[in-house]
From Swiss-Prot:
The gene is dnaK. Gene3D superfamilies: 1.20.1270.10, 3.30.420.40, Actin, Chain A, domain 4, Substrate Binding Domain Of DNAk, Chain A, domain 1. Residues 514-542, 605-638 are annotated as: Disordered. It comes from Rhizobium leguminosarum. This is Chaperone protein DnaK. NCBIfam families: PRK00290.1, prok_dnaK. Belongs to the heat shock protein 70 family.
Length: 638
């Protein structure tokens, strides 16, 4: 049976894991790393780079290197948080065809879902390379506190790669699975997940294979990227104060600042002070300018203190919704790269009154949990029951713009709930069902997920028609809403599943694009392998020609030299052709045969000159027989 993989599609880094026997195992990528940067870059010649290769060239190609795009999923272009990010990232955020925030590279627009598909493809290929077989099914994680229809987002890019998403689970829940799989005694735990782009807090009861989420809360725009941006803003302000130059308008400088900020932030988790040194960051009429600045842990903590404090309110809300106090939490599990920051750990300790658990790798635990859930669905992991919840209340707009809840927040999913409504006016022949999500009392203050009309109602007095509205949420958090007129049996429904602004035609195009890139990648890899073989052969042929060229005729030397030159030209081409390189490699090997024969004869002659005359053919046979007999005798005597 083909393996089902677990993928943590993160804002900053992504990770893929699989069940290996009874244990979940993180799969290393082609670069030998256990996590892959969630970055995609496009070079001037159209080549696409994903992961570490994209990160390595970011400084020289800042406008076409895309990172943290997951933060834009489901965001409108006019969103205040998007507006702020637009001025702090080196690439361009544009308005998509559907009004959502998209990104641009080399003059072409991409939806966040398309970029996610490219990263997913990298994770899929990583797993296939390790397993040695095609991967067709996966469990993918999403932030627990997505405040709209975004839990469905991973399905679309995954489908474009031929990857069936068996289950979408929340990141803290996945982390709890990895943490508590071997825990038999009952525990109440809090999973504090501060990742690259989002913050989640979940309260769970675990024990004897049952993982029940009691509540979840969070902030969809709070993560490591915000900490980096805060430090970038500080560096920009300091440089402007000292030099009078605003680096915000310099894309290359911004990319260098972003990398330096991330590096400094990481270093200050283990040291008290670091130095940021960026020579030639910019230049003016007086010459080049350099940025050199000492940064202490205390200064960093003062810059980001309000960001850390923003995690407290969601934690308190989650505790209240779960009906427990901080003292009743047995263990606090830290997840996400930002949880390594000492200030974050200090705040968690103060809030929950205990040292947080640091026994899991915060970068890998979510992918491991996804792999365990994949194992559950595949039947490899027995006696595990996962009960997740919906993070926000769901309902419809009723008379006067009131938000009427059908499903309360933190309801265990899957779930189904129905309620009967009626018309507000006499002879009303249609009703509009507006589906919203949130905790405000008025529908306009909540997030509108979608709407649809139930039409052709028979004329009747107000309050007479019986319209049954049903909310159905599956285990993936995907919402389906239906409205049925009990009198006529007429029914309409809507599936709340964000598509990232892509039509079916767009999705089909993405499938073809993915296939096209797979072919291009294969060709590029073949060309590199052929070039490596060619360069090795050229080197050995040139050395042999130099050392033993006098052993062959002038015509043979010329033929070998010409073949070497032809192979060099083919392998050094700007767009090398693997077939052409292979053909010219074969030609060089063939014309070099006489040279190889001459080398062999020369070596044999040298061997004879050293006082060991080459034995006759007959002698060889006798020697072999003699040695065999002697060996047998040794065996007998033994």
């Amino acid at each position: 049976m083909a393996k089902v993989i677990g993928i943590d599609l993160g804002t900053t880094n992504s990770c893929v894991a699989v069940m290996d026997g009874k244990d979940a195992k993180v799969i290393e990528n082609a670069e030998g790393a256990r996590t892959t940067p969630s970055m995609v870059a496009f070079s001037d010649d159209g080549e696409r780079l994903v992961g570490q290769p994209a990160k390595r060239q970011a400084v020289t190609n800042p406008t076409n290197t895309l990172f943290a795009v997951k933060r834009l999923i489901g965001r409108r272009y006019e969103d205040p948080t998007v507006e702020k990010d637009k001025h702090l990232v080196p690439f361009t955020i544009v308005k998509g065809d559907n009004g959502d925030a998209w990104v641009e590279a080399n003059g072409k627009g991409y939806s966040p879902a398309q970029i996610s598909a490219m990263i997913l493809q990298k994770m899929k290929e990583t797993a296939e390379s390790y397993l040695g077989e095609k991967v067709e099914k996966a469990v993918i994680t999403v932030p627990a506190y997505f405040n709209d229809a975004r839990p469905g987002q991973p399905r679309m890019p995954a489908a474009s790669l031929g990857l069936e998403v068996l289950r979408i689970i929340n990141e803290p829940t996945a982390a709890a699975l990895a943490y508590g799989l071997d825990k038999k005694e009952g525990k109440t735990i809090a999973v504090y997940d501060l990742g690259g782009g989002t913050f989640d807090i979940s309260i769970l009861e675990i024990g004897d294979g049952v993982f029940e989420v009691k509540s979840t809360n969070g902030d969809t725009f709070l993560g490591g990227e915000d900490f980096d941006m805060r430090l970038v803003e500080y560096l920009v302000a300091e440089f402007k104060r000292d030099n009078g130059i605003d680096l915000k308008n310099d894309k290359l400088a911004l990319q260098r600042l972003k990398e330096a900020a991330e590096k400094a932030k990481i270093e200050l988790s283990s040291s008290q002070q670091t130095e940021i040194n960026l020579p030639f960051i910019t230049a003016d009429a007086s010459g080049p300018k350099h940025l050199t600045l000492k940064l202490t842990r205390a200064k960093l903590e003062s810059l980001v203190d309000d960001l850390v404090q923003r995690t407290i309110a969601p934690c308190k809300a989650a505790l209240k919704d779960a009906g427990v106090t901080a003292a009743e939490i047995d263990e606090v599990v830290l997840v996400g790269g930002m949880s390594r920051m000492p200030k974050v750990q200090e705040v968690v300790k103060q809030l929950f009154g205990k040292e947080p658990h640091k026994g899991v790798n915060p970068d890998e635990v979510v992918a491991l949990g996804a792999a365990i859930q994949a194992g559950v669905l595949q039947g490899d992991v027995k006696d595990v029951l996962l009960l997740d919840v919906t993070p926000l209340s769901l309902g419809i707009e009723t008379l006067g713009g009131v938000f009427t809840r059908l499903i309360e927040r933190n309801t265990t999913i899957p779930t189904k709930k129905s309620q009967t409504f009626s018309t507000a006016e006499d002879n009303q022949q249609a009703v509009t069902i507006r589906v919203s999500q949130g905790e405000r009392e008025m529908a306009a203050d909540n997030k509108l997920l979608g709407q649809f009309d139930l039409v052709c109602l028979p004329p009747s007095p107000r309050g007479m028609p019986q319209i049954e509205v049903t909310f159905d949420i599956d285990a993936n958090g995907i919402v389906q809403v239906s409205a049925k007129d009990k009198g006529t049996g007429k029914e309409q429904q809507i599936r709340i599943q964000a598509s990232g602004g892509l039509s079916d035609a767009d999705i089909e195009k993405m499938v073809k694009d993915a296939e096209a890139h797979a072919t291009e990648d294969k060709k590029r890899r073949e060309a590199v392998e052929a070039r490596n073989q060619a360069e090795s052969l050229i080197h050995s042929s040139e050395k042999s020609l130099k050392d033993y060229g006098d052993k062959v005729s002038e015509a043979d030397r010329t033929a070998i030299s010409d073949a070497i030159a032809a192979l060099k030209t083919a392998s050094e081409a700007s767009e090398p052709d693997a077939d052409d390189i292979k053909a010219k490699t074969q030609t060089l090997m063939e014309v070099s045969m006489k040279l190889g024969q001459a080398i062999y004869e020369a070596q044999q002659a040298e061997s004879g000159a050293a006082g060991m005359p080459p034995p006759k053919a007959g002698d060889n046979v006798v020697d072999a027989d003699y040695e065999e007999i002697k060996d047998d005798d040794r065996k007998k005597s033994a």
